[in-house]
């Protein structure tokens, strides 16, 4: 069974299928993708398909980061091995993940504006092309904390952000990020996904001394 057949079998709802096609379209322009919040594995299948679309001389790379390694992660690893895509899983908090260069970041952890800003502001100097944010409709105006009526102080401590950040929705956080990072622009918003694109290449992170 091809990866596309797997996607077709998993998602028959038009909006869900379109979300995956957006990941595949922009992801196919990438050689390395990092995903924060990989549990469930659905977006991961689209990432693998995107990297397969762009497979060339060098192995593409997919790094999945999550607090839990469930069966879906193991399935992603098996699929990646089958199609010769380098797959790495990092168990832990996204805030502790070591930064490195990549073409794209897919962000789908606990949906709070403060969490998004903390993760993305740390990672963005290393991201060459795209940032995908999932959950921007259901938790766009208010955060997952507010929507689910969770203990804001406890969540803020767990996510290492302020209580205001835990209450902030994703859309105002994205607007705040774009205002202070003018080399990024929003290029797509559909359903639960928003895509940001870097408009200016990142500065050399490893400058050569004269």
Sequence positions of predicted segments:
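A short alpha-helical cap/connector motif
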Residues: 1-210
């Amino acid at each position: 069974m091809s990866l596309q057949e797997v996607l077709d079998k998993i998602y028959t709802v038009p909006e869900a299928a379109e979300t995956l096609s957006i990941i595949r379209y922009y992801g196919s322009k990438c050689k390395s993708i990092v995903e924060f919040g990989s549990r469930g594995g659905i977006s991961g299948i689209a990432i693998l398909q995107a990297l397969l679309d762009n497979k060339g001389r060098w192995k593409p790379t997919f790094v999945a980061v999550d607090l839990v390694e469930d069966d879906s992660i193991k399935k992603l690893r098996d699929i990646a091995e089958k199609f010769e895509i380098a797959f790495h899983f990092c168990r832990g908090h996204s805030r502790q993940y070591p930064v490195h260069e990549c073409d794209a970041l897919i962000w789908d952890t606990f949906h709070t504006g403060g969490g998004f800003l903390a993760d993305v502001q740390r990672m963005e100097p290393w991201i060459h092309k795209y940032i995908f944010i999932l959950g921007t409709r259901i938790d766009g105006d208010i955060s997952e904390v507010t929507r689910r009526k969770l203990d804001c102080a406890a969540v803020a401590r767990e996510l290492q952000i302020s209580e205001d950040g835990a209450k902030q929705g994703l859309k105002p956080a994205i607007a705040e990020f774009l205002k202070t990072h003018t080399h990024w622009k929003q290029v797509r918003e559909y359903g639960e996904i928003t895509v940001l694109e870097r408009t200016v290449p990142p500065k050399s992170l490893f400058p050569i001394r004269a």
